[in-house]
């Protein structure tokens, strides 16, 4: 049994353990950020209290895309929220009778399971701005964290 746990060479086993710990420290210290959902704004895609991972390096080589679920920083270092990107830089976003309009055309949202009756006047996004909203549209618009944020507020892409 000892041979299975330690192997034939205890020194090599120790080196492997140290390397594995180093990989985990780098992964969870710099690349992957665990985030817990608090609330129902992302139902049914992400249930309340579910644990997810955010890839902080996801947007180093390409820009965020419409439909990506991202973690955004809204209120200081610990104020992270999970939201879906529906509007990209330069686009005009509006809500009319619960439907999202991008540049005047209805956005197909296969992930949306709960309809709403939201109305929001058109807003044109700047060159570095995105429009975020949760998947659970059954909540009143006033109770829903949503809206326009600059690219710098995106922490990373949600993996799980």
Residues of each region from the PLM?
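Extended hydrophobic leader/signal-anchor segments used for secretion and membrane insertion
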Residues: 1-160
């Amino acid at each position: 049994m000892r041979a299975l746990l330690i192997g034939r060479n205890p020194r090599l086993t120790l080196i492997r353990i140290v390397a594995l710990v180093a990989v985990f420290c780098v992964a969870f210290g710099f690349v992957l950020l665990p985030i817990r959902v608090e609330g129902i704004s992302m139902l049914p895609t992400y249930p309340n209290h579910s644990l997810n991972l955010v890839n902080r390096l996801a947007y180093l080589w390409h820009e965020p895309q419409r439909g990506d679920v991202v973690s955004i920083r809204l209120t200081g270092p610990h104020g992270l929220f999970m939201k879906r990107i529906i509007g990209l830089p330069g686009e005009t976003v509006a809500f009319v009778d619960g439907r999202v309009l991008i540049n005047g055309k209805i956005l197909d949202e296969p992930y949306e399971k709960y309809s709403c009756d939201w109305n929001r006047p058109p807003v044109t996004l700047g060159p570095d701005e995105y429009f975020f909203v949760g998947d659970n549209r059954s909540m009143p618009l006033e109770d829903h964290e949503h809206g326009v944020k600059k690219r710098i507020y995106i922490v990373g892409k949600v993996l799980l």
